[in-house]
Amino acid sequence: MRLITRLARPLLRLIGRDDRGAIGVLVAVLIGGGVLLGMGALVIDVGQLYQNRAELQNGADAGALAVAQSCAAGTCAPSLAAQFATANASKLTGGAAGVALVCGSGSLGACPASSGAITDCPTAPAGANYVDVHTSTRTAGGSSLLPPAFAALLLGNSGYQGSTVKACAQAEWGAPTALTSGLAVTISACSWDNYTDIGTTFAPAPPYPPDSLPSASQDRVLQFHGKGSNTSCTTEPSGADAPGNFGWTVDSTGNCQTYINGSTYGVKTGASASQACKTALAADQANQTLVFIPVYVSVVGNGANAYYTLKGFAAFVITGYRVPGASASDWLNPANNCSGSSFCLNGYFTQGLIPGPGTMGGTNLGASIAQLSG
């Protein structure tokens, strides 16, 4: 009735008071002929289709991002798509949603060519890792048709059983080209190669279930300006830590972080750590924080004018450290604690997902980004 009133109100304003009775008769005729009933049925049924489309799109978006994140972490889990599609369904379909296809890079299987339709995903991105998640209508009873609320009751429309709604979302994952590092330190590519067997051996990433820490044998010692046990990585005189284990970078934020957006970044000479870095080291070590740090292939120049050449970003968990004026015992393998005149970072390399969006296209050293792309 509210719909009828809204439709009739503009007409009533255009006519005189004496003619409004005639309009009432006209409305009654329209109701009797099913015209306004048909309009109401159209509004309600189309509204349901739009609602189902929104739910399916939300489910596809969430599912594609979840699958991309699992792939970035090292193990693609396409079954996540169905979980998120169902989680975004409402009582309109009895809490059910269908996943017609999950496809993409690697083990996900190749996707068919895009149809260009609004309900389809865009063409596969060239040279990128991606996943497409296609969702479609499914009711709790297993039907692929969204049943009409009123449309089937209209004259001549008794055979209408409903419609199938579709949606698609695409997500990508890959290594970043720019990043604000979790700690203003850097390590050499030589050390990363040796400690990860050239990117083939990683410890599991935090958080960990009780009694499920990584093996102590995966704990590494990154010496500052020294070879340590990593005899294949040489070192240069103090103040130029290439290509030996780790060194400090220029703090871009005042919180012991370095913003890197390009192929080079600044060197901070010397072994001493700022108070901000001592605070950050203590928090990261105590909380088993996954930090993302740049990996360099060379150092150019000398002293404060020197700069590192970026290879990529690694994911690292600090288990202990010893720097001038601050230290913490290695919680994974205390036998690796530094002593005497040595300064070091202890920890292990893993694979991890950088929170938030970013620019992909870098060399994958364990740190990845996952984000929606279409």
For the regions a protein language model found, what residue spans apply to each?
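N-linked glycosylation sequons
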Residues: T75-A82, G95-G374
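Alpha-helical assembly-interface signal, strongest on the long, hydrophobic N-terminal helix that forms
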Residues: R2-A87
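Conserved, well-folded catalytic cores of nucleic-acid-processing
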Residues: S70, A87-L92, S136, E172
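Coil-to-alpha-helix initiation sites in intrinsically disordered, low-complexity, charged segments
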Residues: M1-R2, S144
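Enrichment for repetitive, rod-forming helical segments
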Residues: A60, T93-G95
